[in-house]
Amino acid sequence: NRQQEIFVEILKDKDKEIFMNDRYQSPLSERYASKEMQYIFSPDKKFKTWRKLWIALAETEKELGLDITQEQIDELKAHAEDINYDVAKEREKLVRHDVMSHVYAYGVHNIKAKGIIHLGATSCYVGDNTDIIIMTEALKLVRVKLLNVINELSKFAMKYKDLPTLGFTHFQPAQPTTVGKRASLWLMDLVYDLEDLDHVIANMRLLGSKGTTGTQASFLELFEGNHETIKKIDGMIAKKMGFDKCQPVSGQTYSRKVDSRVINVLSQIAQSAHKFSNDIRLLQHLKEVEEPFEKN
């Protein structure tokens, strides 16, 4: 049909940009995601974080004695925000590697510093560390919103703590309770979730710069086998990126148990939200609790 033809024409027209780089786009994000969360998972956030990581690495290597000048560092910082997507996109068609394409694109802006970009690192240095940073920021945003729900629900529970209502077991009439007491059950689940969320956030650690197999072999070569110097790399990078520590041991990638922890705590929050909303839906059927509907 005509709509499909128009879409194909747009895709063919290289002068038309159909994606926005300052937000994450999916069929669900426009309806359900906040602008803050969309930005956290956006291309802009991702690639600007890559560049921050490259700057942190270069600064660390300079401070530990490699032949890197402050002029080179300043040049990297001057172009940290202006992501040249067009250059990276064209380069990726040639090399078929996203990280190397962006190393090249960053180097186009940094004539004097292009030789020190990504020095000694692997793709996972930017890829995995950025994933950790993005997940941590996203979890902190979830925490803010979870605290808001807990606060509002606690007010609701206190307001209706003495309002009697029928309690149920197996959704069969049982004994009297109060509306506030019922709300406190939803509230308690969310408090459990907050405790678990705080634990996950507190234990988020950067990967660091571990090299191809987690042995930092490339840095052993760069620093001529100086183990004491190499031991300082991860801690210095972590501090520059706002973290207390890096994972003490890993391969090239961070342990995917980290992803499992994140998914698990998000699942727990979703389970609590489901219990909360499902109870309201059932009570709405009984005309005991109703959600508001606006005129339009």
List where the protein language model places each region.
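Intrinsic-disorder-associated, low-complexity terminal segments enriched in Asp/Asn/His/Tyr and depleted
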Residues: N1, D13-D15
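Cationic, low-complexity basic patches in intrinsically disordered or flexible, solvent-exposed regions
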Residues: Q4
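A helix-coil-helix interface module used to build multimeric assemblies
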Residues: I18-A217, E228-A238
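Intrinsically disordered or highly flexible coil/loop and linker segments, enriched in small
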Residues: E63-D67, K112, K159-D162, N203, ...
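Glycine-rich anion/phosphate-binding loop at the beta-strand->alpha-helix junction
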Residues: D193, D244, Q252-N296
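A short, charged helix-loop
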Residues: M236-Q252
